């Protein structure tokens, strides 16, 4: 019988136990498979083995506690033999906007010694086109006794595929199960093996393609969103110049049946939309002109917000600035590539005034924000001359906007402004 069809995936290893890896490992464990989570962060490993979590994601704590107590999930810092390996490590970009694949290479070096004939390796990390082939090459360099798809094609000992995550923070557990998945194997048998694995827990469609198309698919999805956000952000700056309320404008423009303008903000953050388009630009710099421009527009938006804060600060002798929200999107604790972090950090560096932060989803400010106070909303409002809304957390919607009347308000998300329009 074909090895791909015969594979049973009794033991599955997930390398990288962050915002994607840990929920994926937990969902697999809930299907009563033995799951070995691997992470270089000893604190994360210890926390998980105690049945607790080191990240914020709704309902994840209960599932991890159950999976660990039932013996289906455990974490370690060193890879162990398994039937399938899912790599979910970061893929940031370097200072020159080129992709940094060092985490993927490190994962390949870590799992290579425990690979055996018939194993499946899946790259889940969002990656530039060609990264899955590079992963196969790195693995083969460590294990010349095994054959890999870029060498032996369908007859390889090890199957290698790419299956990018496509989940929304705050809804990860539901979307891991319900969303369609794009599965791109380096060969048809690689795709078949990966499809078998994901069908253990995915209720959505598993759509099979090749590895390069799967890689480009995820980049395309995020570049599409980035371009549309850039349109909204640019529109907000134009409206400020010509004296039009952008929130009201978007609301009425979206009444057109074929118009759906997104909401502007202080920039674009997170580990996907703020990063992935650069992978396309790096691969085809002369052709990716619109994608590059969208990235530049969104990267420039924090500076635009800062200019507005500077103008407001000139009205006060010793301004106190309260910044509401630090995460890259609403209702999560993830600060990766957050424009709010950049804005607050620059306020401190440029000494615009006393800077306060309200971020209900974290207990300690990042080291980059030394000199900033973390307060609750009431304490911050009682001291603030200027209030800057950077993230539209649900908690901030409950704020009595009458409390803002005597303060300068810079609402980058339209949350309080929209309430006033509706009223």
Curated annotation (Swiss-Prot):
GO annotation, biological process: lipopolysaccharide biosynthetic process
Database matches in InterPro entries: 6-PGluconate_DH-like_C_sf, NAD(P)-bd_dom_sf, UDP-Glc/GDP-Man, UDP-Glc/GDP-Man_DH_C, UDP-Glc/GDP-Man_DH_C_sf, UDP-Glc/GDP-Man_DH_dimer, UDP-Glc/GDP-Man_DH_N, UDP_ManNAc/GlcNAc_DH
Domain of life: Bacteria
Residues the entry annotates as binding NAD(+): 11-28
GO molecular function: NAD binding; oxidoreductase activity, acting on the CH-CH group of donors, NAD or NADP as acceptor; oxidoreductase activity, acting on the CH-OH group of donors, NAD or NADP as acceptor
A Pfam match: UDPG_MGDP_dh_N
Protein EC: 1.1.1.-
Residue numbers annotated as active site: 218 (proton donor/acceptor), 272 (nucleophile)
Keywords in alphabetical order: Lipopolysaccharide biosynthesis, NAD, Oxidoreductase, Plasmid
Family: Belongs to the UDP-glucose/GDP-mannose dehydrogenase family.
Record function comment: Probably involved in the synthesis of sugar components of EPS I, by converting NDP-N-acetyl-D-galactosamine into NDP-N-acetyl-D-galactosaminuronic acid.
Name under which the protein is recorded: NDP-N-acetyl-D-galactosaminuronic acid dehydrogenase
Lineage: Bacteria, Pseudomonadati, Pseudomonadota, Betaproteobacteria, Burkholderiales
């Amino acid at each position: 019988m074909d090895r791909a069809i015969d594979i049973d995936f009794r033991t599955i290893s997930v390398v990288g136990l962050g915002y994607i890896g840990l929920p994926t490992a937990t969902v697999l464990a809930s299907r009563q498979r033995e799951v070995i989570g691997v992470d270089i962060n000893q604190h994360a490993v210890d926390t998980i083995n105690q049945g607790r979590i080191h990240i914020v994601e709704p309902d994840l704590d209960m599932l991890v506690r159950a999976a660990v107590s039932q013996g289906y999930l455990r974490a370690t810092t060193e890879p162990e033999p398994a039937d399938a390996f899912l790599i979910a490590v970061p893929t940031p970009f370097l200072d020159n906007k080129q992709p940094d694949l060092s985490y993927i290479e490190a994962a390949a070096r870590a799992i290579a010694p425990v690979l055996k004939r018939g194993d499946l390796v899946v790259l889940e990390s969002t990656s530039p086109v060609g990264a899955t082939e590079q992963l196969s090459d790195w693995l083969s360099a460590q294990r010349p006794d095994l054959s890999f798809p870029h060498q032996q094609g369908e007859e390889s000992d090890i199957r290698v595929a790419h299956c990018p995550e496509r989940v929304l923070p705050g809804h990860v557990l539901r979307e891991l199960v319900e969303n369609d998945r794009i599965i791109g194997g380096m060969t048809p048998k690689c795709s078949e093996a990966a499809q078998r694995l994901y069908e253990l827990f995915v209720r959505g469609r598993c759509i099979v393609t090749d590895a390069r198309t799967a890689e480009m698919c995820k980049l395309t999805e995020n570049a599409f969103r980035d371009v549309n956000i850039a349109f909204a952000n640019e529109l907000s700056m134009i409206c400020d110049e010509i004296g039009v309320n952008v929130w009201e404008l978007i609301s009425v423009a979206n009444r057109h049946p074929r118009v759906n303008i997104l909401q502007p903000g202080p920039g674009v953050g997170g580990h996907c939309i703020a990063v992935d388009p650069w992978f396309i630009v790096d691969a085809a710099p002369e052709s990716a002109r619109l994608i590059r421009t969208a990235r530049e527009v969104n990267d420039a938006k924090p500076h635009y917000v800062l200019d507005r804060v500077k103008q407001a600060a000139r009205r006060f002798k010793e301004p106190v600035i309260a910044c509401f929200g630090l995460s890259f999107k609403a209702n999560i604790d993830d600060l990766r590539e957050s424009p709010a972090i950049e804005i607050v950090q620059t306020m401190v560096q440029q000494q615009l005034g006393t800077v306060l932060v309200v971020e209900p989803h974290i207990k300690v400010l990042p080291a980059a924000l030394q000199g900033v106070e973390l307060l609750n909303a009431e304490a911050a409002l009682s001291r603030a001359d200027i209030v800057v809304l950077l993230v539209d957390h649900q908690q901030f919607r409950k704020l009595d906007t009458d409390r803002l009347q005597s303060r300068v308000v810079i609402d980058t998300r339209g949350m309080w402004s929209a309430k006033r329009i509706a009223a």
